[in-house]
């Protein structure tokens, strides 16, 4: 597998994990369990919480995984020789957004789910998600989408005007049809 394909597949996987995080965050928010784990970053009773904290703790665990995946995606995009400027830019925006989400998520908990902060957390999450969608689409279209054939290749001639054999090799013989 070439590096660009790896970057694309890794970015798609990151996008899927991010979607599950946003889904879980919506559930945490709407079910009212956002403060069931009032400490940050851990819950009471140590690293592995009791079942009453499980939903919120699952959201935090997925968030930590997502943060790592987004940062790794950014590193992979920046290391790719074929990434265009806009892909790199949106990858950096995604990395900055994930760092902002971590800080904002902690603030949401310490400020006891203040409505403005919860809304900002959702808004920044949408920016993060949109940025990653752009990275995935742009990586595909700039690096991996098959290039269209030129008229000369469709006509069976090479760029030098020589007739191609069925195997695609140019022939030195001039044939009159």
Task: Identify the function of each model-found stretch.
Residues 1-177:
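Polytopic transmembrane helical bundles with strong interfacial aromatic enrichment
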């Amino acid at each position: 597998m070439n590096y660009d394909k790896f970057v694309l597949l890794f970015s798609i996987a990151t996008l899927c994990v991010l979607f599950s995080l946003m889904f879980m965050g919506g559930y945490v928010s709407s079910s009212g369990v956002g403060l069931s784990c009032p400490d940050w970053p851990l819950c009471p009773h140590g690293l592995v919480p009791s079942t009453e904290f499980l939903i919120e703790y699952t959201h935090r665990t997925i968030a930590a995984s997502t943060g790592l995946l987004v940062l790794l995606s950014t590193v992979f995009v920046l290391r790719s020789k074929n990434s265009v400027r806009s892909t790199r830019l949106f990858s950096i925006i995604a990395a900055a957004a994930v760092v902002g989400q971590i800080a904002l998520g902690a603030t949401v908990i310490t400020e006891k789910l203040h409505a403005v902060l919860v809304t900002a957390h959702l808004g920044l999450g949408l920016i993060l998600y949109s940025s990653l969608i752009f990275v995935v689409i742009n990586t595909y279209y700039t690096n991996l989408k098959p290039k269209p054939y030129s008229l000369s290749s469709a006509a069976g001639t090479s760029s030098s005007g020589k007739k191609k054999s069925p195997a695609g090799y140019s022939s030195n013989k001039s044939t009159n049809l």
